[in-house]
């Protein structure tokens, strides 16, 4: 089979909105007390479980009547009984006042500088120079949640988005063939830079946070990710997909930036040779791509079926070049 991949677009701000509901919430404390709910996409170093368990730090900022800061980078923690989040500094709703809130969270403070005077909207990042899944900085910023009148007393919904870039490769089982994801290598990338949120989305608007990224240093770092156990599909009937992911600083792509994927497909199986895994190595040259079928605010998905019966789809996510453009990479089929 031929496995050459084409790049249609690699500047994809990969942020999905997720829903949450207040149904069944149990009130705790004063009915006038300002409480929160923190939700975000379960991917990256910080997922919903680690956030709920307090493994990542979550801080809230809040302004009353467009001028009075009532929450100044205040830590919030989750109450397990109700699922609601409470700040270390208590505040009550005031009827007739308007409010604006947002929050940020991070997985580690080593290599991360947060400008608290900018309420977490500006950061500096130094990611590890060799890829370590457990040591990567994961930074999240919520949408802005606005309340027109404190008399409404809502639970403040904090929808957190990842600010870092994600490179994800999926293999989806096609017909009768098994596949294994072996290794990802991302070459000549930046690991250091500053990031500034230039447009913060408002909750429930359908928009997303937009970051201005200024990398610094040299783009000569190589990230390699090899699963401890090869990601396998097809070993069980219900096991129909596998994926690998690298998280890093949003990149400004150069002619030297290259992504390499290694995977195996069980091909030409016979009764005498039930396991005939063939290694494939695909190289993505990520420079001078041309975006196609761009539509702001929507994830565009392309799929293709390789003749082995395995559907391959690669997603290169959240690159900062001229603008955030959505797209994917695809195998070329002959």
Where would I find each of the regions flagged by the language model?
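Sec-type signal peptide cleavage vicinity
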Residues: 2-6, 17-334
